[in-house]
């Protein structure tokens, strides 16, 4: 609903809340943005549909890049009390490879924390920094002034929250993003995934595990992987994820696939019982959305499809994009500035990652390259580094330079570039 000039306030406007910065969504991206904005002295209000703590479909993995962002937020001591993972164990096509996290630009360990705990802890950081919270409130629409700027966000209760600046972090489906004109383009790869929790005596292992040869109960090779992430609390996060496009939709029932994957690993891991708390998700990836910014609003995190197409990771991108969006709040207009920031930080990597992920949706590509790749420890070290988003602009080694060149070339030939 677009705002219009009126002679006086409506009853809804008379009872509306007003804030400088309104953040919609209290997950890692939204709470990160709120914390950094509040630290700069701004008046910040965060709203979220859920009451916290709340669960979220996720592998719970915190990459070294995510660990670095959490430490910047002041959560280093909290993380020190959580499990630390040395690297990634990959299995498939008749081989097993362990690759330590590569560094040196990021911490040497990763972690895994259930989202019920992680999201609440980051939200509390934002609250401790001065951000106000309004939980159990769903944003469904916006009001705009004559210049196209968002003047208020409308809740499902009818209440309007007036704001000068708006950061949208309401997740992959992004109800408010759609109201603002966000479009998801499914011609590039997206992900479908499901996870659960299961007890095991190996819950304190120092390696996360990915099975790259994911097969259906009928034996068909699927474009995806299964994972087991030790949580250090007596359980692991176990799940399966598959890649898809509009032309090649995922042809797998997720819950039966997770149960089958669990059965395959039961003896090896000593699983007790069946996976509990199963949750599935549909994930736009690699910046496959347009309409990520307007005059006074920005989409961040999953709402902006800031998800790695090669591994489905989104927490590190959410934390980073929250911080980066807060740094732009002093600008008058975000329409071009925010897409430019997203392009500078993520477009090269997303472009080439989308192209590689698309190849994985072709069974012949997997069967021909999988066995060769798994038998080369050097190649798998490179794969872990680029798949994990561990290449920075400051890195000058051969792998970093090659990855950046590949990203630039890929972006030039994109039919639709990331975030456009």
Where are these regions (language model features)?
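FAD/FMN-dependent oxidoreductases across multiple families
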Residues: 246-328, 338
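Predominantly flavin-linked oxidoreductase catalytic cores and closely associated redox partners
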Residues: 125-269
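A short, basic/flexible loop-to-alpha-helix module at the beginning of a structural domain
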Residues: 2-18, 302
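Glycine-rich FAD pyrophosphate-binding loop
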Residues: 38-58
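Conserved Rossmann-like nucleotide-cofactor binding loop
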Residues: 29, 52, 173
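Beta1/beta-strand and adjacent pyrophosphate-binding region of the FAD-binding site
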Residues: 13-29
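C-terminal helical "tail/cap" subdomain of flavin- and related membrane-associated enzymes
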Residues: 327-420
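A conserved beta-strand/loop capping segment in the N-terminal third of enzymes
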Residues: 67, 71-121
